[in-house]
């Protein structure tokens, strides 16, 4: 296969594995990085170069995770997501395994090139291993309350530090977003009950029942998450808008309209994640 065709093929495979997760990785990381550009007197070319470097970290960040996640969850994907590359036959299991090793090597190599990102890189590697290679990653508490919080820290801390040194305000907001994610990411499991049950996972809907988990998310997790945003100084940036978005999210969670509807609810949730980070970046630049 010609080199250009091979490169195009690999780009297509990268998109196939990762595009559904961009609104929870590359996009929010990029949005948060904009906030780190405030007050910098660097030339535009330097800022662009730093952002391009961040993209070289974010790309293997999500590719390494999605590859290993899908390599270790083929049985579930055959039920919940049969159109993914491995169950659909687009990529063989062995091919995905080879690519996961390559993505891991690139991801670690970027951090070794820029050691300031090594803590976040090692955190994400550990989080991915915890999720994909241990039984604790199959339990609702380990999967969401722990792993999504540590993953959010790795994503947001690296996205800021790739542009500018961290500040007390940026750290406070990162920790607030980690708490928000730990409480709310259970939303992703509402759409995958059938496959999760088949492989023995203990997600919130399987432990507390479908409607029970929806009540927990809507009336306990979402209000608590808003309180954490308030403690981090984020909710005050646009209280009416953020309150309304969380109310709409809760309304969607309570509706038992099928897995496809629940998937759209999860995507809406990731857009809220991006919006919150946009508010933070706008505030950093004095725009709100």
UniProtKB/Swiss-Prot annotation:
<feature type="transmembrane region" description="Helical">
    <location>
        <begin position="24"/>
        <end position="44"/>
    </location>
</feature>
<feature type="transmembrane region" description="Helical">
    <location>
        <begin position="268"/>
        <end position="288"/>
    </location>
</feature>
<dbReference type="GO" id="GO:0016020">
    <property type="term" value="C:membrane"/>
</dbReference>
<feature type="transmembrane region" description="Helical">
    <location>
        <begin position="101"/>
        <end position="121"/>
    </location>
</feature>
<keyword id="KW-0808">Transferase</keyword>
<feature type="transmembrane region" description="Helical">
    <location>
        <begin position="145"/>
        <end position="165"/>
    </location>
</feature>
<keyword id="KW-0472">Membrane</keyword>
<dbReference type="InterPro" id="IPR050475">
    <property type="entry name" value="Prenyltransferase_related"/>
</dbReference>
<dbReference type="InterPro" id="IPR044878">
    <property type="entry name" value="UbiA_sf"/>
</dbReference>
<protein>
    <recommendedName>
        <fullName>Polyprenyl transferase eriF</fullName>
        <ecNumber>2.5.1.-</ecNumber>
    </recommendedName>
</protein>
<feature type="transmembrane region" description="Helical">
    <location>
        <begin position="51"/>
        <end position="71"/>
    </location>
</feature>
<dbReference type="Pfam" id="PF01040">
    <property type="entry name" value="UbiA"/>
</dbReference>
<keyword id="KW-1133">Transmembrane helix</keyword>
<comment type="function">
    <text>Polyprenyl transferase; part of the gene cluster that mediates the biosynthesis of erinacines, cyathane-xylosides that show unique biological activities, including leishmanicidal activity, stimulating activity for nerve growth-factor synthesis, and agonistic activity toward the kappa opioid receptor. The role of eriF within the pathway has still to be determined. The first step of the erinacines biosynthesis pathway is catalyzed by the geranylgeranyl diphosphate (GGPP) synthase eriE via conversion of farnesyl pyrophosphate and isopentyl pyrophosphate into geranylgeranyl pyrophosphate (GGPP).</text>
</comment>
<feature type="transmembrane region" description="Helical">
    <location>
        <begin position="215"/>
        <end position="235"/>
    </location>
</feature>
<comment type="similarity">
    <text>Belongs to the UbiA prenyltransferase family.</text>
</comment>
<dbReference type="GO" id="GO:0016765">
    <property type="term" value="F:transferase activity, transferring alkyl or aryl (other than methyl) groups"/>
</dbReference>
<dbReference type="InterPro" id="IPR000537">
    <property type="entry name" value="UbiA_prenyltransferase"/>
</dbReference>
<keyword id="KW-0812">Transmembrane</keyword>
């Amino acid at each position: 296969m010609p080199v250009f065709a091979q490169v195009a093929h690999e780009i297509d495979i990268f998109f196939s594995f990762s595009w559904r997760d961009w609104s929870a990785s590359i996009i929010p990381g990029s949005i948060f990085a904009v906030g780190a550009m405030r007050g910098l007197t660097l030339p535009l070319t330097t800022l662009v170069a730093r952002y391009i470097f961040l993209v070289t970290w974010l790309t293997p960040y999500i590719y390494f995770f999605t590859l290993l996640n899908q390599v270790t969850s083929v049985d579930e994907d055959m039920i919940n997501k049969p159109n993914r590359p491995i169950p659909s036959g687009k990529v063989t299991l062995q091919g995905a395994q080879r690519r996961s090793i390559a993505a891991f090597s690139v991801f670690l190599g970027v951090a070794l090139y820029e050691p300031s990102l090594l803590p976040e890189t090692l955190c994400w590697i550990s989080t991915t291993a915890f999720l994909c290679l241990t039984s604790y990653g199959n339990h609702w508490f380990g999967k969401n309350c722990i792993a999504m919080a540590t993953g959010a820290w790795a994503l947001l801390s690296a996205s800021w530090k790739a542009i500018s040194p961290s500040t007390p305000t940026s750290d406070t907001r990162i920790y607030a977003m980690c708490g928000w994610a730990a409480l709310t990411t259970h939303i992703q499991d509402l759409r995958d009950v059938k496959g999760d049950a088949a492989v023995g996972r203990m997600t919130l809907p399987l432990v507390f029942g479908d409607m029970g988990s929806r009540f927990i998310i809507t009336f306990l997790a979402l209000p608590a998450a808003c309180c954490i945003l308030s403690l981090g100084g984020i909710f005050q940036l646009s209280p009416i808008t953020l309150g309304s978005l969380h109310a709409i999210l809760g309304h969607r969670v309570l509706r038992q309209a099928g897995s496809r509807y629940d998937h759209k609810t999860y995507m809406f949730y990731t857009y809220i994640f991006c919006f919150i980070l946009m508010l933070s970046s706008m505030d950093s630049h004095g725009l709100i």
